[in-house]
Amino acid sequence: MLDHGQEDSVVFFADDDNTYDLRLFNELRLTNTLSLFPVGLVTKTGLSSPIVREGKIVGFYDGWISNRKFPVDMAGFAVNLSTLQKASKRRKGRLAMPFTPGYEEDGFLRQLDVQPADAQPLASNCSIVMVWHTKTFYTSRAPVDNLARTKKYKNSNLGILLASL
């Protein structure tokens, strides 16, 4: 893929335990470098999303931030192939998906030498969930974190996003 991929291709890690809104695949085509977008029904908050203000990613809302630079779900990002190719050349072909539970996404994205603020927010500035973690077992609805309703997130996408859950 890195050596023979078509120019302007986009890499997205789809998973069999997710449900996708078909509109997502049109959005993915817009990925120039790295794009980020919300994932529903994930973590204790029920949502993992970039926080967007004035069209820019300014932080993350996730049930487990830890010390991750990119606290995102595997289904919450896409990468333009040219970005992967450049990173691969810088690293002499040593791009990898690290296997450290909870850190795979962060470890992979850190190799790209891209900052979260430089990523493109998709899904109407991250105000629409187009990917859902769905599994076939019973669970109670995740409580909406009351912190998301505070002034800390005022003038961001989270108000619209949480109202849609």
Positions of the model-derived regions?
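Conserved catalytic core of nucleotide-sugar-dependent glycosyltransferases
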Residues: L2-A14, N18-G102, A119, Y138-K154, ...
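Structural motif
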Residues: M130-W132
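Short beta-strand-to-coil "C-cap" segments at the C-terminal boundary of structured domains/repeats
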Residues: T134-T136
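Catalytic donor-sugar/metal-binding loop of nucleotide-sugar-dependent glycosyltransferases
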Residues: G107-I128
